[in-house]
Amino acid sequence: MAAELVEAMNMVKSFRVSDLQTLLASMGRSKSGLKQDLVGRALRLVQTEYSPELLKNVRQLYETRFPKASAWLAARRPETVAVNYPALNSSPRGTGQGTDYLNGIPKPAPPPAAEVKLVPLPFYHNLETLLPPTELVAQNSEKLQESQCVFDLTPNQVDQIRNSSELRPGMKSVQVVLRICYTDSIGVQEDQYPPNIAVKVNQSYCHVPGYYPSNKPGVEPRRPCRPVNITPWLHLSTVTNRVTITWGNFGKRYSVAVYLVRVFTSGELFNQLKHCSVENPDRCRERIQDKLRFDPESEIATTGLRVSLICPLVKMRLGVPCRVLTCAHLQCFDAVFFLQMNEKKPTWTCPVCDKPAPFELLTIDGLLSEILKETPEDVEEIEYLTDGSWRPIRDDKEKERERENSRTPDYPVVDICVPEANGHSPAHSGTNQTGKSGSGGASAGTGSTSGGSGGGTVVDLTLDDSSEEEGGGGAEDSEETDDSQDSPAPKRGRYDYDKDLVTAY
């Protein structure tokens, strides 16, 4: 047991990044990170979860890369190992069969037929397997190869296709799809097209998804590798259907499979998510309290966590807050927009932290759903507190808007009063409105002085010295006094012409 464990660890240390990612993905582990992180993660996996299945996967990966060395290791294995792992095609020592050796040197073992498993897709539910994963075998050394596969439809399968509803005109919800993936590695495989691919169904070429244009300079366009719908070109009867695949042979091995599937829409997936994966608000509060719990060993105490109510995908207010169970953040994204975007361009990546976000791990935040119903539309951010409660966060613009709309002003009020009949302004406004009170008193200044009433003298500051000297005659003063009692005297400037006749440009 110890010798096998050491052997498996040595094999893991010689793996490439792609081999490490395949091994970790086959065992349900994260395959992101640098090579040293992947190696450490794979070694811990071998040490902590050692099993015959894991050892088989490690050996198959190693034999794929080092076929000669794996044959030599297979010849050195004891009989017990060969009995426990017959699928490796390794011959035990001491059998005495001459076919296992050639001139005293053990023959290299043929490459194992790896069991290919395709990753399940949320929008495609497998009903039946029409053609299991089959390797595309090159017939010659030409770069452009052609492979053919055949399959038949049963009457029940034909009825399922014909009686299914339409997603849109001409597209049924029950389809026959073709999927292609790598064969070089083991474990669960994602869809991957070979270069120069072309698919012909019953002598008619079918559509294969093209490349996504890239907005970044110097970045090659990316091709979406999704199942190919071949239903419109099939014989919906018991007649045999033939599929011809043209592909480029550039050293990598591929496998092809055909499935009968039911296609879901983003709305149907959202209904599944809404009925099966909603996190209880009390559980959300417990998680918030755990994050904000005081740590005596930490020098920094967190008193609150701010969460935006704006979806990072579409920059709009959240409708259905959703997040991934494996993510550490509390920030959510809108579930409806997330499913719609993955329906058009499947990436299944968290828009907050860019980590994998498979549909099986999505959940609706029940607490944030209640908060969205209680808060007005203008609130764009909230803060979770240590006791699990929350409070809205308003920015400076909203505070200023509320201050303007409030009835109680924050600044002193200045009263502008009308002068009294005797030409004097009120005492409380004389200091604030000096110019206005003085000019207002000037309109009745002559009348107040001639009448001999009590009070201070009001001086018209708009008149200059020359105007006072011109009007100095006694008879003229009495006439002007009589006129001023009937109507206010017009202000006189230092110009002889009438100001009303001057045109302003």
Swiss-Prot record:
Residues 462-485 have a biased composition (Acidic residues). Residues 395-505 are annotated as: Disordered. Its EC number is 2.3.2.27. CDD domains: SP-RING_PIAS4. Keywords: DNA-binding, Isopeptide bond, Metal-binding, Nucleus, Transcription, Transcription regulation, Transferase, Ubl conjugation, Ubl conjugation pathway, Zinc, Zinc-finger. It comes from the Eukaryota. Pfam families: PINIT (PF14324), SAP (PF02037), zf-MIZ (PF02891). Residues 104-264 form the PINIT domain. InterPro entries: PINIT, PINIT_sf, SAP_dom, SAP_dom_sf, Znf_MIZ, Znf_RING/FYVE/PHD. There is a cross-link at K35, K56, K68 (Glycyl lysine isopeptide (Lys-Gly) (interchain with G-Cter in SUMO2)). Gene3D superfamilies: PINIT domain, SAP domain, Zinc/RING finger domain, C3HC4 (zinc finger). GO terms for molecular function: DNA binding; SUMO ligase activity; transcription coregulator activity; zinc ion binding. This is E3 SUMO-protein ligase PIAS4-A. The gene is pias4a.
